[in-house]
C-alpha cells in the first residue's frame, strides 16, 4: 500500500517500520524483501519478545537484532540540552581505584550540579517523550497511560493471548509497590488470591515485555535452592507514575532509594548487556545482602546501593565486605547519595588471586555520577 503514496525512484530505498510484531507473518514478508529487493534498507522496531523469538530462524544471515535501551542519564541530559560539567572520561568505573584524593574532591565539586537533574530524571523516566514534556505531572501521566497501559492491555492480549488482564494489572501493581526487593511469592498469591502458576506466568510475561527485570540469587546448587527472586521495574519512574506519587517521591527516603537502585541497575544492565554479563543478588546467612552482583567469566563485582542522607561507612556495608572476603572480590562499589563522599574505602583484609595478593577496596560513587559514566561508556562502546 505504501507504494501508492511513494513512487519508485532510482537509488537506495529506506523503509522504517514501527511495532512490526503486530503484523501477521512479518518475518516472512521481511525475508522476501531482503532476498528480492536488494536496493532496500529496512529498519524495524518492536517492543516485545516476538520480535526476537519469531525472527531468529528466518533472519539468520539476513538481519541483525539490536537491543535498544531507554535513555540513560547521560542521554537524558543531552536530549534536554542541560549543561553538563566537564568530567573526566572513564572507560570503566574500575579506573576510579587509580584516582588521587584531589581528583575525587574536584569531581565532587563539579558534579554537585547534577543531583537535581538526576532527581528529575527519576521522576520523568527514561523515555524520550516523557523526558521532553515540561510538566512532571504530564510526563508521569504519559508514562502511566500511554506506555504502561498499552503494554499491559494491548501487547498482553494481542501478542500473548492473556485473557485475565485485570489480574495481570493487579500483579504489576503489586510489583510497583514492592519493586527492588525480594519477591515473596506466597504473600503475593495470598494477597491477590491467585494461584502460583498463574502468577509465575504473569511475571514471565512482564519480563518478556521488558516491564521488569528478574534477578536470581548468586551461587549454585543448594545455595539457591528455593531462594526467592529479586524484581526491578524497567524504569525508576514507573512506580511513582503508577502509584500517583508525583514529586512526593523525593520526600520519601525509602521510595527514593528504590528508585535510585532501579535506575542504577538499569544502567549497569544496559552497559554490559552485550557482553553477556550475568546479574544476581547475594544474601548471606545473617541476612547480610549485596544488591547486585555482576559476573564476568571468573570475575565477580558486587554493588550496594545506599542512597540516604547520612554518610555511609564500612559499618553500613557489612554484607558487601563479607561478600568480597568470601568470594575473593578485590573491588566493590557503594552507590551513594553523598556527592561529597566520593572516595575509596579500604577493607581490613587482602584478597589472594592467581595473579597475587591485593588489598580489598570499595569505591563510594555518587549515583548521578555512576549513572552518567555508565550511560556514556555504553555509547562509547557502541561507537567502537
Model-inferred region functions:
Residues 21-43:
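Conserved Walker B catalytic segment
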Residues 83-266, 280-284:
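Interdomain hinge/linker elements that couple catalytic modules in large macromolecular machines
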Residues 204, 211-384:
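A cross-kingdom feature that marks ATP-driven nucleic-acid transaction machinery
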Amino acid at each position: 500500500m505504501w507504494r501508492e503514496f511513494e513512487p519508485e525512484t532510482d537509488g537506495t530505498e529506506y523503509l522504517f517500520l514501527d511495532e512490526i510484531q503486530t503484523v501477521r507473518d512479518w518475518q516472512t514478508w521481511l525475508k522476501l524483501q531482503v532476498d528480492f529487493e536488494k536496493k532496500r534498507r529496512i529498519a524495524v522496531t518492536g517492543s516485545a519478545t516476538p520480535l526476537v523469538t519469531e525472527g531468529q530462524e528466518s533472519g539468520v544471515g539476513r538481519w541483525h537484532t539490536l537491543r535498544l535501551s531507554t535513555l540513560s542519564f547521560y542521554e537524558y541530559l543531552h536530549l534536554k540540552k542541560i549543561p553538563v560539567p566537564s568530567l573526566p572520561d572513564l572507560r570503566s568505573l574500575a579506573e576510579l581505584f587509580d584516582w588521587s584524593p584531589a581528583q575525587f574532591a574536584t569531581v565532587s565539586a563539579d558534579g554537585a550540579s547534577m543531583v537535581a537533574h538526576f532527581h528529575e530524571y527519576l521522576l520523568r523516566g527514561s523515555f524520550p517523550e516523557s523526558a521532553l514534556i515540561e510538566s512532571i505531572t504530564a510526563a508521569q501521566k504519559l508514562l502511566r497511560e500511554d506506555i504502561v497501559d498499552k503494554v499491559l492491555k494491548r501487547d498482553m492480549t494481542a501478542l500473548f493471548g492473556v485473557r485475565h488482564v485485570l489480574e495481570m494489572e493487579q500483579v504489576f501493581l503489586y510489583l510497583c509497590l514492592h519493586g527492588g526487593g525480594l519477591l515473596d511469592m506466597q504473600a503475593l498469591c495470598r494477597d491477590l488470591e491467585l494461584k502460583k502458576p498463574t502468577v509465575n506466568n504473569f511475571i514471565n510475561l512482564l519480563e518478556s515485555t521488558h516491564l521488569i527485570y528478574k534477578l536470581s540469587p548468586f551461587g549454585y546448587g543448594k545455595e539457591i535452592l528455593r531462594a526467592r527472586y529479586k524484581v526491578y521495574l524497567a524504569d525508576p519512574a514507573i512506580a511513582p507514575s503508577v502509584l500517583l506519587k508525583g514529586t512526593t517521591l523525593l520526600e520519601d527516603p525509602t521510595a527514593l532509594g528504590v528508585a535510585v537502585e532501579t535506575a542504577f541497575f538499569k544502567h549497569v544492565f544496559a552497559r554490559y548487556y552485550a557482553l553477556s554479563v550475568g546479574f544476581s543478588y547475594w544474601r548471606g546467612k545473617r541476612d547480610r545482602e549485596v544488591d547486585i552482583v555482576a559476573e564476568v567469566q571468573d570475575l565477580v563485582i558486587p554493588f550496594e546501593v545506599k542512597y540516604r542522607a547520612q554518610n555511609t561507612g564500612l559499618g553500613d556495608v557489612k554484607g558487601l565486605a563479607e561478600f568480597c572476603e568470601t568470594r575473593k572480590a578485590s573491588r566493590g562499589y557503594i552507590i551513594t547519595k553523598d556527592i561529597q563522599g566520593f572516595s575509596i574505602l579500604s577493607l581490613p583484609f587482602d584478597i589472594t588471586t592467581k595473579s597475587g595478593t591485593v588489598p580489598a577496596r570499595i569505591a563510594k560513587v555518587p549515583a548521578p555520577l555512576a549513572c552518567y559514566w555508565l550511560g556514556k561508556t555504553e555509547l562509547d562502546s557502541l561507537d567502537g
